[in-house]
Regions:
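Conserved N-terminal phosphate-binding loop of PLP-dependent enzymes in the Aspartate aminotransferase
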Residues: 2-444
Length: 444
């Protein structure tokens, strides 16, 4: 599995295979697909922290398929478990119980905070969030929900309505019943205040939104502990505990969207919301849960799950799929053995120290933020004006690719670099990525 198929070559010429793939992409796939890089990179092979494109060029993957390949590409344990399960039973639906399904639910109950215990598996984070909305409404008897500005919840009608960025919303798909509060974006505080003297004014906005734009009773509030597509915006201490008090006061439940922050990604804890000492009634998860196999999950306290009995049938054709659950069980085992939250924390400290140094010596770095191996760099025209500079992000993207490093980007203004390597990344690989970033920022 670890044998290299090619040496590291970063001067890439677009070959015949690439041209054929991109031509078919244009002809047969929706044009709305977002492709990274001026010359898109069709991938052919992955191993550990590395991927190789169809032209034989090898890259260090520092974005992990959007925070999904938690334990690296093609980990032998996952490959073995998946192959064994595929030779035994590929599909069951939720109509028939099987060992992987219940074992994974039991495992998740053991690592999630508080009373979270009852799982319902689906196919994606979007589905998980939709199910969370339904569960919150069914449990509380209330209809309206809150989310945060700059948040992101996926491609469905409810997912796009929960999303707090106009670029990701589709007018014809917006549905009623959702309100958005100010997000805890300290770097660009709309109140022009600073933590802690601000006394968490952004958290107080949640109550103002409830009082002025809803009927005064809500089903809940869905929040990402660290906003993913929003640019890794990281709330200050105390923010979520204050928000939880407000939400529960008005009859709602807290929904933690851990699609990007879950499974040790933020270091020290299994789930991001734990850093703020909040125990949600509902939690959603996907992406890194199965290292690339399609899966979403909505886990609730027993009272929420029990309240839905008799409120309509639930079935999911691909939910709890035997192969995906086998992959997920193996993924969590690997995390426990090779990339525990404490191990991720240590790696995150190393990465953050290097990024802070880059930021101190660069005129274009406005802020470095995040936790663990979920780090963001907000790029600006200059530190004083804080003017977003998405065009500079594009320049950095192309330069890092030429150095054999694949990174991510995001943020409301498209000016945040997102760095999320596999949790199993080695120290040497971290050094390689840091070195490439240092070189690029010194040139930019």
């Amino acid at each position: 599995m670890n044998k290299e198929r090619t040496s590291c070559k970063h001067t890439r010429a677009e070959g015949t295979v690439t041209r054929k793939i991109l031509a078919k992409q244009k002809e047969f796939l929706w044009p709305g697909h977002i492709l990274y890089y001026k010359e898109p990179v069709p991938l052919d092979y992955g191993c550990g922290s590395w991927v190789t494109d169809v032209e034989g060029v090898r890259y260090l993957d520092f974005f992990g398929g959007i925070l999904t390949t938690s334990v690296g590409h093609n980990h032998p344990k996952i490959v073995d478990r998946v192959c064994a399960q595929a030779g035994k039973l590929i599909h069951s639906s939720t109509l028939y119980p099987h060992a992987n399904h219940v074992s994974l639910a039991e495992k998740i109950a053991s690592i999630t905070p508080g009373k979270l215990q009852k799982s319902y598996f689906t196919n994606s984070g979007t589905e998980a969030d939709e199910l969370a909305v339904m569960a919150a409404r069914g449990y509380t008897g209330n209809y309206e929900l809150l989310a945060l500005r700059h948040g992101y919840s996926g491609n469905s009608a409810i997912g796009k309505t929960l999303t707090g960025q106009s670029a990701w919303r589709v007018e014809s798909n917006i549905v009623p019943g959702f309100k958005h509060a100010i997000n805890p974006y300290c770097y660009r505080c709309p109140y022009k205040m600073s933590y802690p003297s601000c006394d968490l004014a952004c958290a107080q906005d949640v109550e103002e939104v409830i009082q002025t734009t809803t009927c005064g009773r809500i089903a809940g509030m869905l929040v990402e502990p660290i906003q993913g597509v929003g640019g890794f915006i990281t709330p200050p201490p105390g923010y979520f505990s204050r928000v939880a008090e407000i939400v529960r006061h008005y009859g709602g439940v807290m929904i933690a969207d851990e699609v990007q922050t879950g499974f040790g990604r933020t270091g020290s804890k299994w789930f991001g919301i734990e850093h703020w000492q909040v125990e949600p009634e509902i939690m959603t998860m996907a992406k890194g849960i199965a290292n690339g196999f399609p899966m979403g999950n909505t886990v609730t306290i027993p009272e929420v799950a029990d309240s839905l009995v008799g409120q309509g049938h639930l079935i999911c054709t691909f939910g709890g799929n035997p192969v995906s659950t086998a992959a997920s069980l193996a993924t969590i085992e690997i995390m426990e053995e090779e990339a525990s939250p404490d191990v991720v924390h240590a790696k995150g400290v190393k990465l953050r120290k290097a990024l802070d140094s880059i930021g101190e010596n660069s005129r274009i770095v406005g802020e470095v933020r995040g936790m663990g191996l979920m780090q963001g760099i907000e790029i600006v025209a200059d530190k004083k004006s804080k003017t977003p500079a998405p065009e500079v992000v594009d320049e950095i993207f192309e330069k890092t690719r030429l150095k054999g490093l694949l990174i991510g980007k995001g943020g409301m203004y498209g000016n945040t670099i997102r760095l999320t390597p596999p949790l199993t990344i080695s120290d040497d690989e971290l050094d390689t990525a840091i070195g490439a970033l240092q070189e690029v920022f010194s040139e930019t």
